[in-house]
Amino acid sequence: MNLNSIPAFDDNYIWVLNDEAGRCLIVDPGDAEPVLNAISANNWQPEAIFLTHHHHDHVGGVKELVEKFPQIVVYGPQETQDKGTTQVVKDGETAFVLGHEFSVIATPGHTLGHICYFSKPYLFCGDTLFSGGCGRLFEGTPSQMYQSLKKLSALPDDTLVCCAHEYTLSNMKFALSILPHDLSINDYYRKVKELRAKNQITLPVILKNERQINVFLRTEDIDLINVINEETLLQQPEERFAWLRSKKDRF
């Protein structure tokens, strides 16, 4: 299996998995044009589309792709039923694509119906988990997003986190504002800054590393707790997550 990233819009990535036979799976195609160009250039045969949630920058290209390749099966959560989904999937179910089983994980927060797809080592997490950050809470609650991130953080260490946006540099600037002396955060920030200066992608990331540099996955970390306690005493990790998310929204 080969993992490919297709840039779209200002900062989206459309992920494509292809096998040796050229069959491919497309994740969150917000725009059809760059996907069609990649299909043509690589001689791929699209077999399926995975949708993580209903936002236009993740579903906008579905109609055109299905018109061009009517054999495509479009998997998605209930909230994408009117966006071209032909196979609604929910938490605990599996999608069998390209000879692999993908587990469906409900991750409400960014939207209420958001889902992720996991087949070791690939995690397609849409706008739930970003490198160094997490999605904004457009529909869900901080508690829901905290629980969603906890689920994803529990996946195997070698999981490849395939996020849908290039937000890593701004996320790491925020992380530094919270934990300015953290060695892992400082090292990763320098690495990301160099990559982005060359206009290079920072994704996918390995989950084991992500747990060290993503403050939203470190709500039980004593260093972070001490920083938060300087401003306010919060007993529960969900409350500390909400504090972080509120800070990030204003950053």
Swiss-Prot record:
GO BP of this protein: methylglyoxal catabolic process to D-lactate via S-lactoyl-glutathione
Pathway(s) the chain acts in: Secondary metabolite metabolism; methylglyoxal degradation; (R)-lactate from methylglyoxal: step 2/2
Binding of Zn(2+) 2, residues: D57, H58, D127, H165
Cofactor(s) this protein cannot do without: Zn(2+)
Keywords from the named record: Hydrolase, Metal-binding, Zinc
Pfam families with a match to the protein in the record: HAGH_C, Lactamase_B
SMART domains listed in its UniProt record: Lactamase_B (SM00849)
GO molecular function: hydroxyacylglutathione hydrolase activity; metal ion binding
InterPro entries: Clx_II_MBL (IPR035680), Glyoxalase_II_hydrolase (IPR050110), HAGH_C (IPR032282), Hydroxyacylglutathione_Hdrlase (IPR017782), Metallo-B-lactamas (IPR001279), RibonucZ/Hydroxyglut_hydro (IPR036866)
The EC number(s) this enzyme carries: 3.1.2.6
Main EC class the enzyme belongs to: hydrolase
Catalysed reaction equations from the record: an S-(2-hydroxyacyl)glutathione + H2O = a 2-hydroxy carboxylate + glutathione + H(+)
Positions bound to Zn(2+) 1: H53, H55, H110, D127
Stated family: Belongs to the metallo-beta-lactamase superfamily. Glyoxalase II family.
Known role: Thiolesterase that catalyzes the hydrolysis of S-D-lactoyl-glutathione to form glutathione and D-lactic acid.
Oligomeric and partner information: Monomer.
Full protein name: Hydroxyacylglutathione hydrolase
Lineage: Bacteria, Pseudomonadati, Pseudomonadota, Gammaproteobacteria, Enterobacterales
